[in-house]
Amino acid sequence: MNMLMILSVNIILSTCLIMIAFWLPQLNVYTEKANPYECGFDPMSSARLPFSMKFFLVAITFLLFDLEIALLLPLPWAIQMHNINMMMSTAFILVSILALGLAYEWLQKGLEWTE
């Protein structure tokens, strides 16, 4: 019962915050806020530079594996637990999911800079 109540409160709170986030920016639409500030001068060109999607994919991959290391670092302390099989299976599942994601990205040529 307690877990069900926590889940329902989290879902309701998340839904409310998402609805507010979509509704709130539509109240005040100012075109001047979208323009870059150029110290009083009119902008010569667009300030919105294109972003490399390849760099974004490599950065996300780096963050995922950095998170993996952060999650696996407490394993030596977790070995002191009585249920080692549960801890090892959780670590194996985590590493397997990340390895499958890396293999998929590699096969889709997401890590190559040139085509």
From Swiss-Prot:
Record EC number: 7.1.1.2
UniProt membrane topology term: Multi-pass membrane protein
Major localization listed first in the record, in broad terms: mitochondrion
Catalytic activity: a ubiquinone + NADH + 5 H(+)(in) = a ubiquinol + NAD(+) + 4 H(+)(out)
Enzyme class: translocase
GO terms for MF: NADH dehydrogenase (ubiquinone) activity
Segment forming the signal sequence: none
BP terms from Gene Ontology: mitochondrial electron transport, NADH to ubiquinone
Keywords: Electron transport, Membrane, Mitochondrion, Mitochondrion inner membrane, NAD, Respiratory chain, Translocase, Transmembrane, Transmembrane helix, Transport, Ubiquinone
Residue ranges crossing the lipid bilayer per the database entry: 4-24, 55-75, 84-104
Source superkingdom: Eukaryota
A Pfam family the protein falls into: Oxidored_q4
GO cellular component entries: mitochondrial inner membrane; NADH dehydrogenase complex
Reported function: Core subunit of the mitochondrial membrane respiratory chain NADH dehydrogenase (Complex I) which catalyzes electron transfer from NADH through the respiratory chain, using ubiquinone as an electron acceptor. Essential for the catalytic activity of complex I.
Protein name: NADH-ubiquinone oxidoreductase chain 3
